[in-house]
Amino acid sequence: MKKELFQYCDSVLHIRKSRRVRTFEKLLDNYWAFREKNHGTLLFITSDIEETYSTIHKAIVTYMDCMDIMNIRKIPNEIFIDCLIGNQEKILIIIKKDYNLEEVKGMRVDQVFIDCIGDSDININSDIIIHYLLPLTVNNNGKYLDNIILIY
């Protein structure tokens, strides 16, 4: 299933489970370095929302000296993390379960991360990427940022 998605993603990262936190830290750091506005939104699609949340939270708290978590909101199938970089730059990180992805239509995000954890199969196909996820990144916040990144 994951290999079918390769051709629809700008970047594909194959990582060991032990390197997840450092990889997520590097992804957040790259976004921070290459964005063009002082605000932005990142969307993580995953089959295991708690595992992805735990990884992102640990990456921010442990390694991101310049980023602070201001607010965390949890609702069924979604987690919102409001972050502050420096004094005034705001980033919203949305972690969404791979269920009912038609709901994202109309959102605007800078990058979409498809997080395939371990051996779990994610409920995403080429139609969802083309019709729902790719249009979200139309107003991408930086010409050097990839639109869709697959992490497995």
Question: What residues fall within each predicted segment?
Answer:
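Phosphate/NTP-binding elements of NTP-utilizing enzymes
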Residues: M1-Y152
